[in-house]
Regions:
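HotDog/MaoC-like acyl-thioester-processing domains
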Residues: 42-103
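Short, structured patches in soluble enzyme cores that scaffold and shape functional sites
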Residues: 38, 52, 68-70, 80-85, ...
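Beta-strand segments within the central parallel beta-sheet cores of soluble alpha/beta enzyme folds
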Residues: 30-31, 65, 279-282
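Hot-dog-fold acyl-thioester-processing enzymes
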Residues: 1-27, 31, 90-95
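Short, conserved secondary-structure segments in the cores of folded domains
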Residues: 30, 35-36, 42
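Anion-binding alpha/beta catalytic cores of soluble intermediary-metabolism enzymes, centered on
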Residues: 103-151, 155-339, 344-411
């Protein structure tokens, strides 16, 4: 709607300037008063100017005049913001996440992601039972993109029939002939355990079938962590890619399982370029309530981070979804947090809420996505039968990054 886009742009741009430039990292919002003056169109280049109009040295409150103009000099918004400036210089490493969403010039986020991993050599991937056109096509397209060297594990006759149906060439593709999907899952896992492949990819078999083979004690792929799934998402309305976890593997995780879910997500975020990811532990409310287990778990997980039991990220929770992704919503509710409004990772209470959240973002919110399983000795490319080609290829690119990371830091 008219005005909504401009309001979102205003909040995002002002927050970016305040948090990175003037006053810089550590700045806390107090209030803002902005007037929307013009419209924003796709492809516009906006310039924000901020100037200190007053400051109180006793309270460190600073008032800044703000103006935003388009490339044509048209005023988009103007007004004032009041903040509490940091009392000492804070430096944080600038990070650049691989984009996975189309930009205004028509370049797809997948193209950005492929460029981001172009310097990495492809990895051998066991593709378990790719006996339908989408899964077989995705494996071969990922090969063509230079991401993987697929080893197809399934009934040779069915694989060749699917290839013929889709006009795909299997002449130079390795095939391990097994009789059925259950054997395909076991053989794919065995290839990974033997070091013959560096990742697994789900084909047309059921997720439970592959995961059961993966986590079997006899398989040899388990680590000290519990396996969990991460959706890497990017929506038009949020300024950075983010992770939703766990929406596919752990149905009703307990406290220790949630800790592993967070550890896995932090590792993924760091691999894709976020040095210290901000982790929002979601619940329906942002206060701790004895009658809501999700809020108790969130509080305990934050204390675990305080005690060094979870490292590598900044944790806060419980946070309602709006407080986790909207600085304005967090400010209205009086939440002072380094995570609120700018989360890199959203930790959901259970699989049902996470799955619904992720799929709402994908199918109704226009989110681009990738899906990966962590916590085993090799990454697992785990996508849904309804996922797009771009989602499958993006998931392979994420697995490529993880596999190269595991060469240096085995899980």
């Amino acid at each position: 709607a008219r005005g909504t886009t401009e309001a979102i742009c205003a909040n995002a741009l002002i927050s970016a300037v305040l948090g990175t430039r003037l006053p810089g990292p550590g700045t806390q919002y107090v209030s803002q008063n902005l007037r929307l003056l013009g419209a924003v169109r796709p492809g516009d280049r906006l310039t924000v100017q901020m100037q200190v109009s007053s400051k109180d040295t006793a309270t460190h409150h600073v008032t800044l005049d703000c103006t935003c103009t388009s490339q044509e000099g048209v005023a988009i918004f103007q007004g004032q913001v009041e903040v509490v400036a940091p009392t000492e210089r804070i430096e944080r490493t600038r990070t650049a996440l691989p984009e996975i969403h189309p930009d205004a010039q028509g370049r797809t986020g997948l193209q950005h992601l492929l460029a981001h991993v172009a310097h990495l050599q492809p990895i051998r991937v066991a593709v378990a039972h790719p006996c339908d056109v989408p899964s077989l096509s995705a494996a071969l397209e990922a090969r063509h993109a230079g991401l993987i060297e697929p080893v197809l594990v399934g009934p040779r006759g069915r694989l060749e029939a699917v290839a013929t149906e889709a006009g795909l060439d299997l002449a130079d593709v390795a095939i391990v002939d097994v009789p059925h999907s259950h054997a395909a899952a076991q053989q794919a896992v065995a290839l990974a355990a033997a070091g013959e492949v560096e990742a697994l990819m789900k084909g047309s078999l059921h997720t439970d079938e592959l995961m059961s083979a993966l986590v079997s004690a006899a398989a040899g792929l388990r680590t000290k962590r519990r396996v969990s799934h991460c959706f890497l998402l990017q929506t038009p309305a949020y300024p950075r890619p983010f992770i939703v976890t766990d929406a596919a593997i752990n149905i009703a995780p307990n406290l220790e399982q949630k800790a592993d879910i967070i550890r896995n997500a932090i590792e993924l975020a760091q691999v894709i370029g976020v040095r210290e990811p901000k982790v929002a532990i979601l619940a329906a409310v942002e206060t701790v309530s004895p009658t809501m287990a999700a809020t108790l778990d969130a509080a305990a997980l934050c204390k675990m981070a305080d005690r060094g039991q979870i490292t590598g990220g900044l944790l806060d929770g419980p946070l309602a979804f709006d407080n986790a992704v909207s600085i304005a919503a967090a400010r209205i509710k009086g939440i002072v947090s380094e995570v609120a409004g700018q989360a890199d990772i959203l930790v959901v209470p259970d699989l049902e809420s996470g799955n619904m959240l992720a799929k709402q973002l994908i199918f109704m919110g226009g989110a681009a996505s990738a899906g990966i399983v962590l916590g085993a000795k090799v990454p697992v490319i785990l996508t849904s039968r309804a996922d797009s080609r771009d989602t499958r290829i993006a998931s392979c690119a994420i697995a490529l990054m993880l596999a190269h990371h595991y060469r240096l830091s085995p899980p």
